[in-house]
A protein has these predicted regions:
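N-proximal low-complexity "stem/linker" segments adjacent to membrane-targeting elements
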Residues: 1-42
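Short, acidic, metal-binding catalytic loop of nucleotide-sugar glycosyltransferases
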Residues: 42-51
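Short acidic/polar active-site loop segments enriched in Thr and Asp
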Residues: 50, 107, 135
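Short beta-strand/loop segment that forms part of the nucleotide-sugar
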Residues: 50-58, 78-82
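Active-site-proximal specificity loops/subdomain of glycosyltransferases
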Residues: 64-109
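Short beta-strand-to-loop acidic/aromatic patch adjacent to the donor-nucleotide binding site
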Residues: 105-119
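Conserved donor-nucleotide/metal-binding helix-loop-beta segment in metal-dependent transferases, i.e.
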Residues: 120-143
Length: 143
């Protein structure tokens, strides 16, 4: 019995174990977000996000140029130019999460919209994540 429990504990996802320096990736699904996107990337990078994976769904404004600017800085790790018109948000977000985990080694993934800003009272999201053994967190939303 002890061996089964030990085996199960060893098989737990990395995120259930306390990770002293977690890798935090944010995924963004955007379309025509030139007004907010740079602010979002700057804010979350300052809050400890290590990198961004962005799916751009047929933007016709300056959004692709902003994405490219931050890709050149090394902040945007991966860009998916989604040309489909069916807006399959679940599939697209799941794809970004799997990339974050499998290709970029994310311990934590935050999915957000360009108008969502994730805040930590100590100004570092990773510090908050280091204190938990959970693999999913619930956060308060304020408008």
């Amino acid at each position: 019995m002890f061996k089964k429990i030990l085996s199960a504990l060893c098989a737990l996802p990395r995120t259930l174990r306390c990770t002293p320096h977690p890798k935090l990736i944010m995924t963004l699904l955007v379309k025509n977000e030139e007004e907010l996107l740079a602010h979002n990337l700057e804010f979350h990078h300052a809050m400890g996000v290590d990198g961004f994976i962005i799916t751009d769904n047929n933007s016709t404004d300056g959004t692709p140029h902003i994405i490219e600017r931050y890709r050149k800085r090394g902040w945007v790790l991966h860009v998916i130019n989604e040309t489909a018109t069916d807006y399959n948000q679940k599939r697209w977000v799941d794809r970004m999460v799997m990339l974050a985990k499998n290709q970029y080694g994310a311990d934590w993934v935050i999915n957000a919209d360009a108008d969502e800003f994730w805040y930590s009272p100590n100004n570092n999201l990773k510090t908050e994540l280091c204190t938990t053994h959970a693999n999913v967190l619930q956060c308060a939303i304020r408008n």
